């Protein structure tokens, strides 16, 4: 069983791509995937807990696909990129945090230029500091 704790990094500033509440996002992702279970979170950073029997790479792709289907079903603009950036929590969790040891913290980014965004957060250096099997990037 894989556990993803999702955050949302919306880099598109347009009324045609509104942000989601945790409840909206949990429901929308669940409606657009047969492979995930979701729960909305009450946390300042983390929005949704996702559970699945898929591998972490398959689940990352599934989350991005469900996210896109959800946006599309609402008639939102789709002329931007989606990125899922994940890192496995390999240390003890902070008390009260939804991101537990062994879970994946996943930032879903919606942006116009993925390469520029990844460069702006120094993604290559962040990846290099983690075990190869403890980090992923899925673009669409």
Swiss-Prot record:
InterPro entries reported in the protein's UniProt record: Uncharacterised_16.1kDa
One of the record's GO cellular component terms: phycobilisome
Keywords: Antenna complex, Phycobilisome
Any Pfam family hit: DUF2656
The name this protein goes by in its record: Uncharacterized 16.1 kDa protein in cpeY 3'region
Species name: Synechococcus sp. (strain WH8020)
Biological classification of the source: Bacteria, Bacillati, Cyanobacteriota, Cyanophyceae, Synechococcales
